[in-house]
Amino acid sequence: MDEYKNIEEKMKKTVSVLKDELNTVRAGRANAAILDRITVDYYGVPTPINQLGTISVPEPRVIVIQPWDAQILKEIEKEIQKSDIGINPNNDGKVIRLVFPPLTEERRKELTKLAKKYGEDAKVAIRSIRRDGIEKKKAMKKNGEITEDDLKSAEKDIQNLTDKYIAEIDKLIEIKEKEILEV
């Protein structure tokens, strides 16, 4: 039974990673999570931007970063420019503003493809977890630890878990696509 919990935990973690990845895909409005992967060299330590100051979303298409240490503004600005978010930071000496332009139709399609790719990667990971789980059960049967009926039952249970998490991934991707394509 612990084996099922282990498999389910791995599948949950895969879905959780997918959610984090989807949060970094920009939809029509500003989302502070888009900055989560950007780190800044702060006194020799790579530090996430959200640990260097306050991040707020005062308007639907604007993110404001207000660092606690104003000397780090230039570094934050430089790292945002180097990142792949495609936004030019506006530094006024106190805060950095990120103004998100409305998405073009072409950019929306690119982002939809990216979201689908993240979804496919997650599905591959789920199927890999299923395969590993079933292989372990087959090895147990081969060693005489479980019966043929136990193996069939285990395969069915693992497949049900797989179906559940694949459906959850499909739902997450569908929601993200609607969010991206929403004008």
Swiss-Prot record:
It comes from Acetivibrio thermocellus (strain ATCC 27405 / DSM 1237 / JCM 9322 / NBRC 103400 / NCIMB 10682 / NRRL B-4536 / VPI 7372). CDD domains: RRF. PANTHER family: MITOCHONDRIAL RIBOSOME RECYCLING FACTOR PSEUDO 1, RIBOSOME RECYCLING FACTOR. Belongs to the RRF family. This is Ribosome-recycling factor. Responsible for the release of ribosomes from messenger RNA at the termination of protein biosynthesis. May increase the efficiency of translation by recycling ribosomes from one round of translation to another. NCBIfam families: frr. One of its GO terms (biological process) is translational termination. GO terms for molecular function: ribosomal large subunit binding. It is found in: Cytoplasm.
